[in-house]
């Protein structure tokens, strides 16, 4: 009886332990499954991070470079968004002021007026409306007054001594006087129409190639060989139409004073005083207008129209078209070599 009872207790304990183990095994299984899932997720995240790093490295390696010597995975006509990163527009842009441009245009008006005054002197010499002594006195007076005026308005200028200057003047005009007979007959065989046409072309060339920057004080050395030679040659052509050697000498003397010496005088005058520069322009234009009016009203009107256009219309036009200026600079430009003094070659 006791043995039967003991066996029954053992069987109950075994069943209890079996049921206990059966009830706890699903929990353990769930824990193991969750651990496995977490491990897989971590592995996937690591793989994604590695893929992102690889993509970033590939993007860095494949980034477009402005190199012609390196092969890149881009088409020949590909334009990257960083291509124009170094573009600079209108870096040297200078906004012009109307009255400043007008004052600078006076230099052109003065030169045109000087050419016309020279032609007027030739016309009066040809028609004998001005006497020869008056022409000689006027040429000598202009030379002396101009030399004295430069000394007064610009004492710092580097001039030769008075004695040396007069020696140079005597030598120059003495040479012209000695060559006057040759110059008078040099083109004597040319027809009048040829002389007028060649003179007109040469005087136009003189105006186009004149050194206007020197008169406007943009340079300190008068350099206009083509312009000066064209004007002197034009005076030689006109001299062949005059009646005497003295007339030729006076005309070429005027040419030297007008085309070689007068720009130097105007350069020093403007550097000394802008008011004197404006006053000289007004005097020249008024004198030329009155002289042309005595010859022909049409010529006077044409002259006034040309001077008015150059002085007022052209500056307005220049300022108007400034808004269309588009100067492009960038790293593709040629390198500028800078000298030790700071200027560019």
From Swiss-Prot:
Region span, Disordered: 13-62
Gene responsible for this protein: pigC
Pathway this chain belongs to: Glycolipid biosynthesis; glycosylphosphatidylinositol-anchor biosynthesis
UniProt entry keywords in alphabetical sequence: Endoplasmic reticulum, Glycosyltransferase, GPI-anchor biosynthesis, Membrane, Transferase, Transmembrane, Transmembrane helix
Family in the record: Belongs to the PIGC family.
Catalytic reaction(s) noted: a 1,2-diacyl-sn-glycero-3-phospho-(1D-myo-inositol) + UDP-N-acetyl-alpha-D-glucosamine = a 6-(N-acetyl-alpha-D-glucosaminyl)-1-(1,2-diacyl-sn-glycero-3-phospho)-1D-myo-inositol + UDP + H(+)
GO molecular function terms listed in the Swiss-Prot or TrEMBL record: phosphatidylinositol N-acetylglucosaminyltransferase activity
Pfam families: GPI2
UniProt record, GO biological process: GPI anchor biosynthetic process
Lineage of the species this protein comes from: Eukaryota, Amoebozoa, Evosea, Eumycetozoa, Dictyostelia
Transmembrane feature ranges: 106-126, 133-153, 159-179, 194-214, 222-242, 245-265, 276-296, 301-321
Name assigned to this protein: Putative phosphatidylinositol N-acetylglucosaminyltransferase subunit C
Membrane topology of this protein: Multi-pass membrane protein
